[in-house]
Amino acid sequence: MLTLKKSMLLLFFLGTINLSLCEQERDADEEERRDDDEMDVEVEKRFLPLFLPKIICVITKKC
């Protein structure tokens, strides 16, 4: 009975460690995704001011 309790306690302990490691990895993945989204927004902000005057010029034909 004592051996069974020890092995169950060990399994519970290892499972808890595994769960916490998975949560940390998931959090890190979410942060990476969030960083990629922020980079995309920055690229869009830099892209629009460069080509917006040219697009307006082509549309209005007042170049």
Swiss-Prot record:
Keywords: Amphibian defense peptide, Antibiotic, Antimicrobial, Cleavage on pair of basic residues, Cytolysis, Disulfide bond, Fungicide, Hemolysis, Secreted, Signal
GO CC aspect terms: extracellular region
PROSITE patterns reported in the protein's UniProt record: PPASE (PS00387)
Top-level taxonomic group: Eukaryota
GO annotation, biological process: defense response to bacterium; defense response to fungus; killing of cells of another organism
Primary location class: secreted
InterPro entries noted in UniProt: Frog_antimicrobial_propeptide (IPR004275)
Propeptide section residues: 23-44
Pfam families for the chain: FSAP_sig_propep
Distribution of this protein across tissues and organs: Expressed by the skin glands.
Cystine pairings recorded for this chain: 57-63
Signal peptide (UniProt feature, chain positions): 1-22
Localization terms from the record: Secreted
Similarity-based family: Belongs to the frog skin active peptide (FSAP) family. Brevinin subfamily.
Record's function text: The synthetic peptide has antimicrobial activity against Gram-negative bacterium B.dysenteriae (MIC=35 ug/ml), against Gram-positive bacteria S.aureus ATCC 2592 (MIC=4.7 ug/ml) and B.subtilis ATCC 6633 (MIC=9.38 ug/ml) and against fungus C.albicans (MIC=18.75 ug/ml). Has no activity against Gram-negative bacterium E.coli ATCC 25922 but exhibits low hemolytic activity at concentrations up to 200 ug/ml.
Protein's UniProt name: Jingdongin-1
Organism of origin: Amolops jingdongensis (Chinese torrent frog)
